A protein has these predicted regions:
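Glycine/Thr-rich phosphate-binding loops that ligate phosphate moieties of nucleotide
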Residues: 2-197
């Protein structure tokens, strides 16, 4: 398969995986917080909260059809074009930070959709998708994923899921589990599932 980023053999004999990726994810929100939300970060920390919780509240209070603002999430590069740059399209003076934050959340989701569309040329859409990482900690962001992909989004329990995968492989290698499927059945659980609107 030549039109996806990485293809390789999978740990289960006879299976292969395809991977798409680019630096277009939660680092975009991190940039926004670092550059423009330092006062909110200090206030949130004083209240025992995360500044990302504040961002989620702001996004939740901003409707998806409130502004039409578009964000291209290429702050750290773009695998679509070497010259691809991040930008806001449709930014007007009346828009507030909620519009900008929601545009960042949506821009990241649509970048993931671009990757998923490439992968779906080679298989059917799954009944659900699993999401991990920074965006998975945000109910608001996960809801945007569910709404854009129009399938349930399942969030695995835990935070260090790469280490969990390594532990499952070790469990199979040492004979603790008979198969990767058995290891996954025993070790993977889900914190929540969000349905599309």
């Amino acid at each position: 398969v030549h039109d996806v980023f990485i293809t390789s053999r999978y740990v289960i004999p006879g299976y292969y995986y395809m991977l798409e990726g680019s630096p277009t994810s939660a680092s975009n929100l991190e940039w926004m917080v670092t550059e423009f939300f330092q006062a909110e970060k200090k206030l949130a920390e004083a209240d025992g909260k995360s500044v990302y919780d504040v961002c989620n509240e702001i996004v939740a209070s901003t409707g998806p059809k409130d502004s039409g603002l578009i964000f291209l999430p290429f702050l750290y590069g773009c695998n679509v074009s070497l010259d691809g740059k991040a930008c806001f399209i449709g930014l007007d003076g009346w828009q507030k930070r909620g519009h900008v934050l929601r545009a960042i959340y949506e821009g990241v989701v649509f970048a993931h959709k671009w990757h998923m569309d490439k992968l779906l040329k080679h298989r059917d859409m799954p009944d659900s998708i699993r999401l991990t990482g920074g965006a998975a900690r945000s109910v608001e962001w996960v809801q945007i994923f569910a709404d854009v992909f129009q399938v349930p989004v399942r969030i695995p329990a835990g935070t260090e899921l790469g280490a969990l995968g390594a532990a499952m492989c070790a469990g199979v290698a040492t004979g603790e589990f008979d198969s990767y499927e058995a290891a996954a059945d025993a070790m993977v659980s889900f914190a929540r599932t969000q349905e599309p609107n």
